[in-house]
Design a protein with these regions (language model features):
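Domain-level signal for soluble alpha/beta catalytic cores
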Residues: 1-784
């Protein structure tokens, strides 16, 4: 029999029960015992679902109250000293302080889990750190599963991935530690790249970590556990050679102690270049992601050891489309012929990244629904493939026929393929994606048109989304507020935002985006080729879940999406109103994207739709248009060899969306992250007239990269950290701009906040913007 299993299941619950339990606990409505009771009920339900789907092994330990990497840190006792942990078992207070911060200490850093939209808590390491088994969580959950008669397969983040994803910290800097999102100045970024005086290599901690892993494995063996899954997705990255050597020595060390059989799981990309080393590891099996990297199978089947299991992920754990079961079975047949029962079938990776259960979607039309599979349905697919291999395809002929019909329907449906969109794409030439003139000519035309002062001020787009705004939007959605009354309410809010910016003296105002719920959903709801679910939630981090749109077909823009609002806002002021759009790459990155054509093609379709909107904004008299691309860097492939191809089409998609703008229309873009150095040529290739970036937290250090690269266009470095409720002083902002003037010519600088102001309160925003405008006046007086 071919064994079937899952690498992990969503934690959130069918009705987001985990979120509700966490928020009730944080607001002290329930106690720890009740929180743990609800968590146990969720685990029980999720395990039984997987058992009902026919899984031979049930993952245990994949469930977390916040994040599995944070769980691993607590299990290993890797607790930063600032949380006051004094040994023993890590309590829930410490766990949540690390995740969310406390009244006295900031949270640990959070960043994206490889190239997914899930965020993990980044482990912090210091040179003399000691590791001890500091949590009973995993063993308690194994007992729960065994009490239900389940064949539990514990899931652990492996030692190489755990250390690779962490950061070295200088303990002396802890006293000055500030909460920073996505970067920390006291970290060694990447392997062997010392920053500050934290210049030790975290790989040197491996000999200290391994005894704790060995202790965990020994205890699991003592509990009668047959298999343990060690996740090592970092092997799909471009790891330095010494890390690969460390992998071999680490697993050799672990193999010497008592242990269940180890299934080493890789996913998210190919590990074919390390096939020989991985096959030689003293583990009982390997898992490969054949959705992301089907071509790697041959390297592993060649001389695959006769004593090892090979688990193959053929059902996509990261997207929502129904599997082509015939194709999956065909891929697996040679492996099944060679390996027999040593072949296991699984999803490509943990199902953490897909919604829970398609059966909840009662409002999706039958045709579209037939093309989809959420986590529960994906396990059904895995089980079906396993049966087809074990019993022959005749045993599952009816199920295969149903799946085949759905796949065929998706291939041929007129809802998917729009000839007009195909024609537009085919019509794109090499010159498409180039503005009419070079930046110098555009800059001159824009200065003549707008006559802005030196160091012009603007904001990034959104203004505070008050409870009144959210209430009006909800009432409108429910039909309790007519469209006409909703429009009046939003216009009143826009008028207030514009008036406030006039009073403050902001040179390039925005309309504040009160009508927008989310920067991707707002556009997706108005574009053809998109669909939305009611319950398609996935975890972003902790208790924050997102419901990505589904891009199922060719994308086009039936009618203008933002023009009415921008035109109204411009009618209220003589100053140039900035139009606000979300860029093609960000819309792509934050959606479930169709898998029947290259992502590049979908990005270009979205770019053409955005270009239509840019044209209509220009025709309506809007002369400054921002096309946001906060997710531009997130799309980077895991391996550097694949970067150029992605960056070429991503920058082209942006240029196509902006290309229609004449010289005197100024195109802005906005990005917010901490690492620009390695993609600056691609950012320059976007050819936006102005780029605004998040720099206040790094004290303008990010600008050094732009200066070294000699970035040719205008830059608005953020001087107001909108992630904090703190109001920065005039002196602080002037100080930041003085740093900026040292590395970027004064005539190319703008002054703006780091990001949109949507999450802040008016009581914070008003004084902060007043100080920003005053800072601009002082910097102008000195440098203009």
């Amino acid at each position: 029999m071919t064994s079937v299993h899952s690498l992990g299941f969503p934690r959130i619950g069918h009705k987001r029960e985990l979120k509700k339990a966490l928020e009730s606990f944080w607001s002290k409505e329930i106690d720890e015992q009740e929180l743990q009771s609800r968590a146990a009920q969720l685990r029980d339900r999720h395990w039984k679902i997987q058992q009902t789907c026919g899984m031979d092994f049930i993952p245990v330990g994949d469930f977390s109250l916040y994040d599995h990497m944070l769980d691993m840190s607590c299990t290993l006792g890797a607790i930063p000293p600032r949380y006051g942990f004094s040994g023993g078992l890590v309590g829930l207070d410490t766990f949540f302080a690390m995740a969310r911060g406390s009244s006295t200490q900031p949270a640990m850093e959070m960043t994206k889990w490889f190239d997914t939209n899930y965020h993990f808590i980044v482990p912090e390491f210091h040179e003399n750190m000691e590791f001890h088994l500091s949590s009973e969580r995993l063993f308690d959950q194994i007992k729960e599963a065994q009490a239900l008669g389940l064949k539990a397969k514990p899931v652990l983040v492996g030692p190489i991935t755990y250390l690779w994803l962490g950061k070295e910290k200088d303990l002396n800097a802890e006293a000055h530690h500030e909460a920073q999102h996505h970067h920390d100045d006291s970290a060694c970024h990447g392997h062997g790249a010392p920053v500050g005086n934290a210049c030790f290599d975290r790989l040197t901690l491996l000999p200290k970590v391994l005894p704790v892993y060995a202790e965990i494995l020994e205890r699991l063996a003592g509990m009668g556990v047959e298999w343990v899954q060690m996740d090592e997705p970092a092997l799909a990255l471009d790891l330095p050679a010494e890390w690969h050597q460390a992998l071999t020595s680490a697993y050799q060390t672990l193999s010497k102690g008592k242990s269940p059989k180890v299934l080493l799981a890789t996913y998210f990309d190919s590990v074919a270049e390390h096939a020989e080393a991985l096959k030689a590891l003293p583990v009982a099996g390997l898992h490969l992601d054949l959705r992301r990297a089907p071509q790697q199978l041959d390297s592993f089947l060649k001389n695959y050891p006769a004593d090892k299991v090979l688990s193959l992920g053929v059902v996509d754990g990261r997207n929502v489309w129904r599997a082509d079961l015939d194709a999956a079975i065909k891929i697996l047949e040679p492996a099944h012929k060679q390996l027999g029962d040593r072949l296991w079938v699984a999803p490509s990776c943990s199902l953490l990244h897909t919604p829970v259960d398609l059966d909840q979607e009662t409002e999706l039309d039958t045709e579209l629904k037939s093309w989809l599979a959420f986590s529960v349905q994906k396990l059904d697919e895995v089980a079906l493939i396993g049966r087809a291999l074990s019993e022959g395809v005749a045993a599952v002929a009816q199920e295969l026929s149903t799946a085949r019909a759905a796949v065929q329907s998706r291939k041929t449906s007129p809802r998917i393929h729009n000839p007009a969109v195909a024609q537009r794409l085919e019509g794109l030439g090499k010159d498409d994606g180039q503005r009419k003139s070079a930046f110098q000519a555009r800059e001159a035309a824009q200065r003549a048109r707008f006559k802005l002062p030196a160091f012009p001020t603007t904001s990034i787009g959104s203004f505070p989304q008050t409870p009144e705004i959210r209430k009006a939007r909800l009432q409108n959605r429910k039909g309790e507020l007519s469209n006409a009354d909703y429009q009046k309410a939003m216009e009143a809010e826009i008028a207030l935002v514009v008036k406030e910016q006039e009073r403050l003296g902001i040179d390039v105002p925005v309309h504040g985006e009160p009508e927008r719920n989310d920067m991707v959903e707002y556009f997706g709801e108005q574009l053809a080729g998109f669909a939305f679910t009611r319950h398609g939630w996935v975890q972003s981090y902790g208790s924050r879940y997102v419901k990505p749109p589904l891009i199922f077909g060719d994308v086009s823009r039936p009618t203008p999406m933002t023009v009415t609002w921008s035109k109204y806002a411009q009618s209220l002021t003589q100053r140039p109103m900035k139009g606000m759009l979300t860029g093609p790459v960000t819309i792509l990155q934050w959606s479930f994207v169709r898998d029947d054509q290259p992502r590049e093609k979908t990005a270009l379709q979205i770019a053409l739709a955005i270009r239509d909107e840019v044209k209509d904004l220009i025709d309506a008299g809007i002369g400054i248009i921002q096309i946001d691309e906060p997710a531009y860097r997130e799309g980077l492939p895991l391996k550097r060899k694949d970067w150029d191809q992605y960056l070429n089409w991503a920058s082209r998609a942006f240029r196509i969306s902006a290309q229609i703008a004449p010289d005197d229309v100024q195109i802005h873009t906005h990005m917010c992250y901490s690492e620009f150095n390695d993609i600056l040529p691609a950012i320059a290739a976007m050819d936006a007239d102005v780029i605004t970036i998040e720099t206040s937290r790094s004290q303008m250090e990010l600008l050094d990269a732009f200066a070294t690269f000699n970035y040719p266009n205008e830059i608005g470095p953020g001087v107001y950290d909108i992630h904090s409720p703190r109001v920065p002083s005039v002196e602080e902002m002037v100080g930041l701009m003085e740093k900026a003037v040292k590395v970027v010519p004064a005539e190319r600088l703008w002054i703006n906040p780091d990001c949109g102001l949507k999450t802040r309160k008016w009581a914070e925003v008003t004084p902060a913007l007043e100080n920003m405008v005053e800072a601009a006046k002082q910097v102008r007086a000195k440098h203009a």
